Amino acid sequence: YQSCCGTTLCFGCICAVYDTGGPSGGLCPFCRTPAITSHEEFVERNKKRAEGGDAGATFQLGRLYSRGRRGLPQDYGKAIELWLRAGELGSASANQNIGACYYNGQGVERDDRKARCYDELAAMRGTVKARHNLGLFEYTAGNTERAVKHWMVGAGAGFDNSLDGVRRHSFEEGLATKDDFEKALRSHKEASDEMKSDQRDACAAANF
């Protein structure tokens, strides 16, 4: 996440930038702002963008507090507060992270119902991991048909765990048809192929 302009770089782009000797002149490859030189500067840039209503920056601040990174103390309560704000601003990832906190009891009392509610919101906003989690909730509740539907969506978006869910929890247990699995396999491959690039392949090969 580029705290200067709010742009998010994939690992392939990051590798491409550093493969050419790093950002030209120490500048952001997108907005040309000078690169940060300290944790304090990174945090301050994020805070400034968050104060201006930037959902991405607000989400990133929450991540920093949840992990105790960039000189900030680990504080799940503060992280959730920021993610709630980011969710109001439209961040699906913030919704999903709050759901994870409720599921794991991090910073809040464990509550599967609330965890599911936040995963549902995140899934409706397009977060594939949250969609996969809904499949797990349904499978645990014995609603295998619904679980498979969620995992089919996740597999179609290229999410490996969802494809494994269709295979391991459904097809191999006789709870899904061969056609279901083959359809999931095809859609997963199509999505994965669309996301491929020479830069991402090089990044993976370098174990970046």
Where would I find each of the regions flagged by the language model?
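Short cysteine-rich clusters marking metal-coordination/redox-active sites
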Residues: Y1-Q2, C10, C28-C31
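Cys/His-coordinated zinc-finger cores
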Residues: C4-S24
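Start-of-helix register in tetratricopeptide repeats
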Residues: G56, S93, K129, N161-L163
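Hydrophobic face of amphipathic alpha-helices that form TPR/SEL1-like repeat modules
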Residues: T58-G68, L72, N97-N104, V108, ...
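TPR-repeat structural position
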Residues: Y76, D112, T144, K178-F181
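Terminal, low-structured helical/coil segments at or just beyond the last alpha-helical repeat
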Residues: H169-F208
